[in-house]
Amino acid sequence: MKIFESHNVGETSKIAQEFAKTLKEGSIVALSGDLGAGKTAFTAGIAKALGVREAVTSPTFTIVNQYDGDMTVYHFDAYRLENVTPDDCDWMDDYFFSDGVCIIEWAKNIEAVLPRGYISVQIEKDSALGEDYRKITIDETGETKC
């Protein structure tokens, strides 16, 4: 488990870009954090490191966006999904078992259908340390829940 501290969006992006160097085809990144914690900013940092040139936006209404770069990035937003079962989300397997990287915001909402071995990234705000302060915990062991 690795813990990072960020004091602004630029630092969050740099942390994500460094983290992206550890990803490989088939990696699944499960993001958790409150609204406005920086999940999309973290995703944008990963995408940038993987050669994506277009702007990354949260796919709240489409559920998944695809970005092509040196490696394909599938960016999910599971905010609107609740009480999912494997049958509800069997379409996700096409992404989870692809040659791209899956990054899932609000992953706890679909935790029941995530394949084993995903990487958990938790982003926490702490206003006592500043409005833009973030604690970013990356657990690559798969032991921490999203």
Question: Residue locations for each model-derived region?
Answer:
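N-terminal pre-Walker A segment at the start of P-loop NTPase domains
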Residues: 1-18
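Short phosphate-coordinating micro-motif centered on Lys-Gly-acidic
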Residues: 2, 85, 93-146
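Phosphate-binding P-loop
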Residues: 19-26
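Hydrophobic anchor at the beta1->P-loop junction of P-loop NTPases
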Residues: 29-31
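The conserved Walker
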Residues: 35
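Conserved lysine of the Walker
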Residues: 39
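Short beta-strand-centered segment that lines the nucleotide-binding/catalytic pocket of NTP-utilizing
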Residues: 52-67
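Switch II (G3) loop of P-loop NTPases
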Residues: 75-82
